[in-house]
Structure formats: structure tokens, C-alpha cells
């Protein structure tokens, strides 16, 4: 992609609309009609996080191509994340208290929450983005684009088992998945979920001006 300025107003508009959809996804039933409810909550709403991830990687890749360092971006992101973590500390404390765990495990619990799950279920996204970005940068460096693509797709497919676990209940893989879930709670994280979308945004920037996206194709 070249360095000329591009109009990003549509991207911003979609980000705003998807932000609203994220709120709706975490709300109760939206519509009485099953089809409409599914369309908004389970279809359109579930597109929000992938969209944000792809946009993030797209612009981070652009900064790299322009010779800019992304360290400042991630420093600012970590500062904001730390601020929101502090705000949610009381919530996290009462959550751990509700689990009736020994006080000795509170500090390790807070550390795990900060580095992995987020102090609130709304904060998981930031550590997942950071870890996912580190993973694809490392993979691209050592195994190249093709190897990275294969790896992140395999990781994503493994992570998808959380959603479709009913299909593996009679297999030997199910006990392994159950053990993983009992420890790590979810596959919606920086290892299994975010890398594939971050790589998509990364490659989208690289191929944005190729015939794949610019050449009109008649149906």
C-alpha cells in the first residue's frame, strides 16, 4: 500500500456502529423474532471484535511500512489498560471474594487477570491484542508468511472447539479441552483467537493495492 492519505471516515463509522453492537451482544434478548435476534446478536454482533482486530493490525502494519515504531502505541495502550484495571479493581476483588478462595490466592489472581483475562470481562481484548501481535511478529520473523498463516489458522481451529465442543464430546480430545478450560477459562485470547485476525489485517495492508482488491470483476 502506498503512503498517500486515504479517507478513513467509513472505517470510523463502522467502528462506531460495531461499538454499539458490542454493547448489544452483552445485553439480553434484543428482538422477539428469533431470526432478527440471531441476525443482530449472533451474526452482526460477532463481527465487531474481528473488525477491530483487522483494523488495528492494518494501521500498525502501515506504521511499520512508514518506518515508524509501534512501541509508543503499545505503551499508550498499556497505560490506558492499567488505568481501567485500577478502576475495575473493586469489581475484581468482589468477584474473587465471591469464589470463596483463600486470601493467599488474591495476588496471583489479580496478576493473572491483568496479564490474561482482564479485571473485567470487557478488558480481555487489550492483553489479547498485545499477545496476538507479539505472536504474529515472532512467527513472521522465524517461519515466514505461509508458516504464520498455517499456524494461526490451526490455533484458531483449536480455539473454536470451545464453541463447538459438543462435536468432540466422544473423542479423546474432549478431556484435554476440558482440562484447558478449567485452568484458562476460555480460548478467546491472544493465543487462539486474535492472531488470525491480526494477520488478516497485516496482510490486507500489504495487498491493499494489488489486483485482488483494486481490479473490478464482473459477475
Per-region residue spans from a language model:
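Specific transmembrane alpha-helix
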Residues: 49-63, 125-137, 172-212
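Membrane-cytosol interface segments of multi-pass membrane proteins
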Residues: 1-168, 214-218
Amino acid at each position: 500500500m502506498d503512503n498517500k492519505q486515504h479517507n478513513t471516515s467509513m472505517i470510523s463509522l463502522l467502528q462506531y456502529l460495531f461499538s454499539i453492537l458490542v454493547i448489544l451482544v452483552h445485553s439480553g434478548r434484543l428482538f422477539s423474532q428469533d431470526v432478527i435476534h440471531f441476525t443482530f446478536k449472533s451474526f452482526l454482533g460477532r463481527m465487531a471484535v474481528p473488525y477491530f482486530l483487522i483494523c488495528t493490525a492494518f494501521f500498525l502494519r502501515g506504521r511499520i511500512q512508514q518506518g515508524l515504531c509501534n512501541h509508543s502505541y503499545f505503551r499508550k495502550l498499556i497505560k490506558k489498560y492499567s488505568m481501567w484495571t485500577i478502576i475495575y479493581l473493586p469489581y475484581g476483588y468482589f468477584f474473587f471474594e465471591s469464589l470463596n478462595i483463600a486470601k493467599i490466592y488474591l495476588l496471583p489472581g489479580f496478576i493473572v487477570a491483568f496479564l490474561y483475562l482482564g479485571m473485567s470481562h470487557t478488558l480481555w481484548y487489550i492483553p489479547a491484542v498485545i499477545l496476538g501481535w507479539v505472536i504474529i511478529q515472532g512467527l513472521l520473523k522465524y517461519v515466514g508468511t505461509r508458516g504464520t498463516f498455517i499456524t494461526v489458522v490451526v490455533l484458531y481451529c483449536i480455539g473454536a472447539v470451545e464453541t463447538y465442543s459438543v462435536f468432540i464430546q466422544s473423542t479423546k480430545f474432549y478431556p484435554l479441552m476440558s482440562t484447558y478450560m478449567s485452568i484458562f477459562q476460555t480460548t478467546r485470547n491472544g493465543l487462539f483467537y486474535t492472531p488470525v485476525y491480526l494477520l488478516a489485517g497485516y496482510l490486507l495492508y500489504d495487498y491493499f493495492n494489488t489486483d485482488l482488491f483494486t481490479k473490478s470483476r464482473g459477475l
